[in-house]
Amino acid sequence: MFKINIITAFPEVFPGSLDVSILAKARQKKIWDLNTVDLKKCTSQIHSIDDKPFGGGPGMVIRADVLQNAYEKAKIFFKDYNFENVEKIMLTPNGEEFNHSTAEVLAKKKGLLIICGRYEGIDERFIEYNNLRKISIGKYVLCGGETAASVISEAVLRLLPDVLGNEKSRLEESFVNDMLEYPHYTKPRVWNNLLVPEVLLSGNHKEIRKWRSEKALYFTKKIMKKNKKNDS
């Protein structure tokens, strides 16, 4: 069973979208499981998990001692596992950018221990002491790491064996082999005077594969060009 444990100041956020559709069914089948550790219950001072930053500046910083209490508590969820095979992730805007390749690597682990940041950030000593892997889900800032934790968890969970109903769909989707996926069409054949491409109705599977490959390449180049322009 693949296990995910999330350290957060807002455990009520979870499971959220992780408990619907195919992921809910996979959890019922015990393919994976989820636990949360409430930071507010890991401090000796009532609901006090943060303090002012040394050196001044805006916002509040989550305390290292509170985080470590939560971290030790989170380890218990993995007591039957080799903890070395659990990826320990700190969600932060200054981490490596998460992508499909990262998800594939994480899916080969035994589980994930995810720490959600909040406020101005967390005490850097906690990250260094536990040798955490810093990960970001994009070049923007959120109010906290809870949304990012759900994004990473979902991307990883759907790669686990037997989670998707059709394993072939996983091999043909976007970002596999660094390619975006081809466009899809279904009934009706005509909608608002827009037609389904004839090749998809032809029954010629060789031509269909060729068309899909060409479209995937076209969209990949188009988006890469746009992303490159946005980064410049």
Predicted feature residues:
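Short, solvent-exposed amphipathic alpha-helical segments in soluble enzyme
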Residues: 21-25, 104-108, 129-130
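A short acidic, often aromatic-flanked loop/helix-cap motif at beta-alpha or helix-coil junctions
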Residues: 40-45, 96, 141-144
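Long, charged alpha-helical interface segments
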Residues: 175-231
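Structured adenosyl-cofactor binding patch, chiefly the S-adenosyl-L-methionine
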Residues: 122, 126-175
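N-terminal nucleotide/polyanion-binding subdomain common to many enzyme families
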Residues: 1-75, 206-223
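S-adenosyl-L-methionine/SAH cofactor-binding core of RNA-modifying enzymes
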Residues: 61-118
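Short clusters of hydrophobic/aromatic residues that line enzyme substrate/ligand-binding pockets
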Residues: 49, 54, 98, 106, ...
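Hydrophobic/aromatic beta-strand patches that form the interior of the parallel beta-sheet core
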Residues: 5-7, 35-37, 87-89, 112-113, ...
